[in-house]
Amino acid sequence: MCIRDRDNVLWKPPGGKTLGFHQDAAYDDWLIPQTMMTCWMSLDDTSKETGTLEYIKGSHKWGLQPPKGEFHSPEDYKKELNIFAEKNNKQIQVTYVEVPAGGVSFHHGFTWHGSGINTSSNNRRAIVSHCVPSNAKFHPTNQGGTAKTYKKYKKENSDLLDEEYFPLLWESNSI
């Protein structure tokens, strides 16, 4: 079973800046279990030139690292990735997510990913859905990071995710 945690609409216009390498699940320390799956749906044809999504092959097996703070438009968008890889003796192999408009890519919440500058004359837009297991619930004590935003949806006296805000997308007996 799967619950939608949140959605994002992304727009990288021509000349649009970088997105620093990060792991999505690192920013969900307000959840137990702290894991997720991300669905990245492209609204435009993507390429390396449009600043498409970049994955690091096998990085979902490297374990979850603490969040590194702001990752929008850093000067060196691979800095945190390079620091982690060097410190932990990991090999970096970049995969560019090049899909046509309407194409979809899924990644594990532990996958290191980011994107470069859009050097093309085209927009790069996407809709992103982050999904968590149906047994996910609010962490009883974590209050920092994105918890400040999402704890406002917590019902009093319950750690369960309220379906009014976190809808059930799929369950095994729904087909």
Protein language model annotation of sequence segments:
Residues 68-70, 104-106, 110-175:
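Non-heme Fe(II)/2-oxoglutarate
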Residues 8, 23-25, 41-45, 57:
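Short, structured patches in soluble enzyme cores that scaffold and shape functional sites
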Residues 6-15:
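Short, glycine/charge-rich beta-strand/loop segments that flank catalytic centers
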Residues 46-112:
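Double-stranded beta-helix
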Residues 29-48, 98-99, 106, 130-134:
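Short, conserved beta-strand element in jelly-roll/cupin
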Residues 1-3:
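Short, small-residue-biased leader/transition segments that mark boundaries at the very start
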Residues 14-27:
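Short acidic (Asp/Glu) patches
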Residues 24-29, 92-94:
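Short, P/G- and charge-enriched loop/turn segments at secondary-structure junctions
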